[in-house]
Amino acid sequence: MPIAQIHILEGRSDEQKETLIREVSEAISRSLDAPLTSVRVIITEMPKVHFGIGGESAKAIGR
């Protein structure tokens, strides 16, 4: 059973996350020739202050 774990910054809509799950699942199914029903996707959202880019938080640089 393929499992994809995706870390994203908070702020995406539920619709965007549903689209991400669907499209990642389809890509994995297609590329690995695995049944779509066997694919698992885990989305982990993190606060912008928990992610650093170039020594500053994503929040501090306006991401």
From Swiss-Prot:
Its EC number is 5.3.2.6. InterPro entries: 4-OT, 4-OT-like_dom, Tautomerase/MIF_sf. It is an enzyme of class 5 (isomerase). This is 2-hydroxymuconate tautomerase. Pathway: Aromatic compound metabolism; salicylate degradation. Gene3D superfamilies: Macrophage Migration Inhibitory Factor. It catalyses: (2Z,4E)-2-hydroxyhexa-2,4-dienedioate = (3E)-2-oxohex-3-enedioate. It comes from Stutzerimonas stutzeri (Pseudomonas stutzeri). Catalyzes the ketonization of 2-hydroxymuconate stereoselectively to yield 2-oxo-3-hexenedioate. Homohexamer. Keywords: Aromatic hydrocarbons catabolism, Isomerase, Plasmid. Belongs to the 4-oxalocrotonate tautomerase family. The active site is at residue 2. GO terms for molecular function: isomerase activity. It holds the Pfam family Tautomerase. The keyword Isomerase applies. GO terms for biological process: salicylic acid catabolic process. It comes from the Bacteria.
